Amino acid sequence: MKAFATRALAFSVAAGQALAAVTQGVSDNTYNRLVEMATISQAAYANLCNIPATIQTVEKIYNAQTDINGWVLRDDSRQEIITVFRGTGSDTNLQLDTNYTLAPFDTLPQCVGCAVHGGYYLGWLSVQDQVQSLVQQQASQYRGYAVTVTGHSLGASMAAITAAQLSATYDNVNLYTFGEPRTGNQAYASYMNEAFDSASPETTRYFRVTHADDGIPNVPPAEQGYVHSGVEYWSVEPHSPQNTYICTGDEIQCCEAQGGQGVNAAHVTYFGMTSGACSW
């Protein structure tokens, strides 16, 4: 709603945050790209229903112990290798969601001092070999293809950790997350912002998409050492390029400023698409 935008801007003034940190409107190309990635991420809840026709499935990613689900896909029309993770879909996933212990990011030693969400790191460890092997196979066969990672909710944090890992091997990895919880500490956030050129919207390859008052980006609490990264793209109704806001600087100014708590209506629906509904 427009009211959300007004409240966010008012909050920025109260917090002393420069208004220039919130910019209204994105290009049609950017908006269409966000919607496309949201479609894939929401479809992951229902075995990739109704994904764009140009995208073909390479292989499924799965670990029974953590119930992490995902797929490696390929879009030859865009020359792109895509990895997508499903969000929370079971009690096993919920156990990962609520493990807020910060775990050292030991699989990425380049990320000095980095720690990430303990539950999602366990998820990453459970599928790391599958993901890296599948992406390597595709990248070797389709040289020059871009590498993109996406996901919603739990899948968003899985995507972020995966993209961080892949960025150590591949140039210009792209990351699109939807309703992403806070995923790591300040060292991790700084690493991600540098690795994904997130100093400005013009250069970023890390699009952290939020919606209205989605409550999940407010967890885990910042007081526990968690910090968001990437450039936030905040979508409000009615969805359009003009109603998409670019939020940089202080993370508590757009979605997070709305006071949403937990899994609410705004969390399960992005750009009018409800997780797994396949009605788009």
From Swiss-Prot:
Biophysicochemical property: temperature dependence: Optimum temperature is 50 degrees Celsius.
Principal EC category: hydrolase
Sugar-bearing residue positions: 99
CDD domains in alphabetical order: Lipase_3 (cd00519)
Keywords assigned: Carbohydrate metabolism, Disulfide bond, Glycoprotein, Hydrolase, Polysaccharide degradation, Secreted, Serine esterase, Signal, Xylan degradation
An example Gene Ontology biological process: antibiotic biosynthetic process
Activity at various pH: Optimum pH is 5.5.
Origin superkingdom: Eukaryota
PTM info: Glycosylated.
Disulfide bonds, paired cysteine numbers: 49-278, 111-114, 247-254
Application in biotechnology: Feruloyl esterase (FAE) is a critical enzyme in bio-extraction of ferulic acid (FA) from plant cell wall. Synergistic action with the endo-xylanase XYN1 leads to the release of 72.32% and 4.00% of the alkali-extractable FA from de-starched wheat bran (DSWB) or de-starched corn bran (DSCB), respectively. Meanwhile, if the substrates were pretreated with 1.75% (for DSWB) or 1.0% (for DSCB) of phosphoric acid (PA) at 90 degrees Celsius for 12 h, the release efficiencies of FA were up to 84.64% for DSWB and 66.73% for DSCB.
Alphabetized Pfam families for the sequence: Lipase_3 (PF01764)
Cell compartment(s), UniProt: Secreted
EC number: 3.1.1.73
Keyword Chaperone: no
Catalyzed chemical reaction(s): feruloyl-polysaccharide + H2O = ferulate + polysaccharide
Signal peptide boundaries: 1-20
GO CC annotation: extracellular region
InterPro entries in the record: AB_hydrolase_fold, AB_hydrolase_lip/est, Fungal_lipase-type
UniProt keyword annotation of Cell wall biogenesis/degradation present: no
Record-annotated active site: 153, 214, 267
One annotated GO molecular function: feruloyl esterase activity
PANTHER family in alphabetical order: FUNGAL LIPASE-LIKE DOMAIN-CONTAINING PROTEIN-RELATED, TRIACYLGLYCEROL LIPASE, PUTATIVE (AFU_ORTHOLOGUE AFUA_6G06510)-RELATED
Entry's family note: Belongs to the AB hydrolase superfamily. FaeA family.
Known role: Involved in degradation of plant cell walls. Hydrolyzes the feruloyl-arabinose ester bond in arabinoxylans, and the feruloyl-galactose ester bond in pectin.
Protein known as: Feruloyl esterase 1
The species this protein was found in: Penicillium parvum (Eupenicillium parvum)
